Amino acid sequence: MKNQICTILGGGGFIGRYLVRNLTKKNYRCIISTRKAFQKGYLKTQATPGAIELVDWNPNNFSELKEAIKNSDVVINLIGILYETRKQKFYNIHTNIPEAVAKICADSDVKKFIHVSAIGANENSKSLYQKSKYQGEVKVLNNFKNTVILRPSVVCGTEDNFTNLFSKLSILPVIPVVGINYKFQPILVDDVADAIVKAIEQKGNDCLLYTSPSPRDNRVS
């Protein structure tokens, strides 16, 4: 399974940086899509020369996407947003783009598609975020057979936005409480990266879905 080519969409983000380290240590070649120039210098230091190829990709330019994917054995989609902006909407990022990626994988020689969704993805959710994640899963499964979907919980680590927000709040004289007895189960980014590598190396051609919370509950009270 080694020396395969993995195209990582959104590979310059938080999870992507850890995943690239894991993959290159196992001698995978990584094609990383990123639009942010400041990330590129950092990514090039993650492996020996030739192990990483950086490509510019506008998520709405599917011709560029085809070019990035055409020689890949595995495609990993890490693209996602936590909130909408004027230019970035949940439905486009979480539903339309995964569907387009799955279709391109089906038309290429891609052997496996790893789609990272989110815990709580649900068709009937009142959250547009969770609903768009679920719809993206359906589109992916309808268009590419050999798909693994991962639903990680809140991903935490030394560079994440979630736990660092609590760290910043701790210096305030009063800390806002987001919900009494609200439970959450964050998962370490290292564990998410490990799970993706295992999904790549797992044999089989069936569509699989994994929900990945931490084994320990945490409570906001």
Identify the role of each PLM range.
Residues 33-37, 58-59:
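N-terminal Rossmann-fold cofactor-binding loop
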Residues 91-95, 114, 133, 185:
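Short alpha-helix in the Rossmann-fold core of NAD(P)-dependent oxidoreductases
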Residues 48-99, 104-107, 119-123:
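NAD(P)H-binding glycine-rich loop region in Rossmannoid oxidoreductase-like domains
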Residues 117, 138-164, 168:
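Conserved beta-loop-beta element that borders a ligand/cofactor-binding pocket
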Residues 6-26:
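N-terminal Rossmann NAD(P)H-binding glycine-rich loop of SDR-like oxidoreductase domains
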Residues 210-221:
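Single conserved hydrophobic/aromatic residue that forms the stacking wall/gate
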